[in-house]
């Protein structure tokens, strides 16, 4: 975040702020400081500079905060404790079907964990009078890796594009250098998460996938939009390629990642014994990726206009419900380690 401020000043895109207090607030603004979303100086400082008071949308703030807590406690932590952690700790003891469900489960776990934190941060910022852009946009409905990165951790992907990919030359220096720039950008994006081979492989998979997609588009030309069935096929293929990357992202090392992938060849005849919450989360979590955006906005808008007593009751009921449905204790957010 601070790097983008310095680079934007160097490029002449913004003027340095003359207020030390404004700069300190930009650098240390606590809601999104640890795990995003990454806020650009031009967006944050502009909100400090205006004299207009930002109306606080209580309904949207409650939706973001309570929704983020639900994603973390009920979705991410339940999937982790009841399915994902056990399989990734001992893949040799899991059936092929159980391993596949654990991989799917981790895809939903990391989405619930990370987007949940982003939603909470954006909601708290909104209560403090700051408006931040959404950081996730139903990423698993993407029909290509390029679209996935327009929907996943949007603030990071745009940061990598603007400050790494463009700085390397972007797509202005010919086809081969464009491929190189894509690959380097994603490799560095992987290393940003940690100096381990699992993150290198994760970044390389996404980089190679983006290169192949670009090569195919260049060979075929812009053409016409894919049919409905074509988009379904592309969406399924993209999701499974992303899941392959998540195996390396989640595994403690390359050997464990190989064991997880090898476990897919195990028995597929015996049904795994799953907690009912896991089954519901897998079904509902997958379905939610394709629901229309803003489906529940009218209800939250009504809540925002309701008396404080009504809002307090909803908050208490939601928290108690999450405590009942969630596991014992709350694990740290995944992105706190990066």
What are these language model-derived features?
Residues 2-337:
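Membrane-embedded transmembrane alpha-helical bundles that form the catalytic cores
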